[in-house]
């Protein structure tokens, strides 16, 4: 997602194959853990390049297509961006990640306001402790699991199906009046 030309080419190919895009879920993320005062600009940018710039490239292409469609009389669409529980909580040693995901929330709220007149909704999804390739090492770590799992009222790690179900809802007509929101999927971790 960090390669602007590749994102634009991929979007053009999608339009060639399907003729239109009704929903776009920009779902990508990378993290780098380390002391903030030892983080290099290159390391900082590497996280923002994917988490924020890649989201911008992807959603810009989709929003432009949806606006043009609406101006031609075919309004509607769904824009979704993946933020993170880390956008709401101070998480030491992953400041670039938290900052980038906080920016996703702000971007999605701004898009919700700007594109509503075109029948487009925009929301962010904030996964908490969801098992993915990026998080697998954390959940396998007994010390981490013993510290975090008891704070999740549902008492389990989230899995992809938890995340996917929210995405399906946000892309459906059932969410046509749901915009500018940040949906936290964390099993109750944040409120506990």
PLM-predicted stretches and their roles:
Residues 35-36, 43-48, 148:
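Substrate-binding pocket helix/loop in short-chain dehydrogenase/reductase
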Residues 59, 100, 108:
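Active-site helix of classical SDR
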Residues 84:
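Residue(s) in the substrate-gating loop at a strand-loop-helix junction
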Residues 156-185, 190:
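C-terminal substrate-recognition "lid" of short-chain dehydrogenase/reductases
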Residues 64, 113-114, 176:
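Alpha-helical segment proximal to the catalytic Tyr-Lys
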Residues 25, 116-121, 178-180:
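Short, small/polar-rich loop/turn modules that mediate ligand/substrate recognition or access, typified
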Residues 36-37, 89-95, 117-118, 155, ...:
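Active-site loop immediately N-terminal to the catalytic Tyr-X3-Lys motif
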């Amino acid at each position: 997602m960090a390669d602007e030309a590749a994102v634009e080419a991929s979007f053009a190919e999608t339009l060639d194959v399907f003729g239109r895009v009704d929903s776009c879920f920009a779902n990508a993320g990378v993290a780098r853990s380390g002391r903030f005062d030892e983080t290099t600009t290159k390391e900082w940018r590497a996280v923002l390049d994917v988490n924020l710039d890649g989201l911008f490239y992807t959603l810009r292409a989709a929003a432009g297509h949806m606006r043009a469609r609406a101006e031609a009389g075919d309004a509607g669409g769904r824009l979704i961006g993946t933020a993170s529980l880390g956008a709401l909580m101070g998480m030491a040693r992953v400041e670039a990640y938290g900052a980038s995901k906080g920016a996703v929330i702000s971007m999605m709220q701004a898009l919700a306001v700007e594109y509503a007149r075109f029948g487009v909704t925009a929301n962010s999804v904030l996964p908490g402790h969801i098992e993915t390739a990026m998080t697998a090492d954390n959940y396998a770590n007994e010390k981490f699991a013993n510290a975090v799992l008891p704070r999740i009222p549902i008492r389990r790690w989230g899995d992809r199906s938890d995340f996917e179900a929210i995405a399906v809802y946000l892309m459906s007509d059932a969410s046509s009046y749901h915009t500018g929101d940040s949906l936290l999927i964390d099993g109750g971790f944040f409120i506990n």
